[in-house]
């Protein structure tokens, strides 16, 4: 349950659906109903945000962002497959859009998509960034990553943790990699690495979510494979990341080998 950030009831329903078993109806407690409603609201909001970001990317307002992705070698098919998007330059653009869809300030604050500030004014977490929706195993958007297109800092910005999203218990691209026919999973460093490798045919590629690789992520990989290939950069940071990840993988019963490489251009 913790891996997927779902309630006990949702976990039972998922298992029953896979097994083709019909569960008897049970009256939910008030707390369970409240938690379930909050999850549904957040999923709906994330979906609306992802659709809006993707729309902006394909609009005139997203011309620069789309050119950036095309210059990185991504095809239209790949951009659509991963649902990539663009957060506009206006600081409250998404806030105004979500308000028009009926979401409250409190709900937006809980989503991590908007910062609610009665003094400075409400403003979006992501603006003027390329957007990478992060999905769970059921293809539902649970969070976002955003990358600047220039030299701004931080280069990458991720959603904070919510009732749906735990960075240390999810892996970017695993929703696709779990379907791969390969016996091994490739672990690389970031969003663009995953997307580029998938486009090249390595659909068994995943990446951590802006944090160091964790034992929980190793346990998650163990559910889908027994072998992991680390494909990190050959710079100091990449080597250190590989050296940290290797023992974690092996301690969790995974065969792990490291392959460092020189990157044609930075990510």
Segments the model singles out, each with a brief description of its role:
Residues 1-110, 129:
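Non-catalytic accessory segments of DNA primases and related replication-initiation nucleases
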Residues 2, 55-57, 85, 164, ...:
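Residue-level marker of alpha-helix boundaries and capping positions
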Residues 34-49, 67, 89-224, 228, ...:
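Phosphate-handling DNA/RNA-contact segment within nucleic-acid enzymes
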Residues 205, 256-258:
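Generic structural signal for residues in well-ordered beta-strands
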Residues 220, 248-254:
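Arginine/glycine-rich "motif VI" loop of SF2 helicases in the C-terminal RecA-like domain
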Residues 232-234:
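Short glycine-centered, acidic/aromatic-flanked micro-motifs in structured strand/loop junctions
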Residues 260-267:
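Conserved small/polar residues in nucleotide/adenosyl-binding loops
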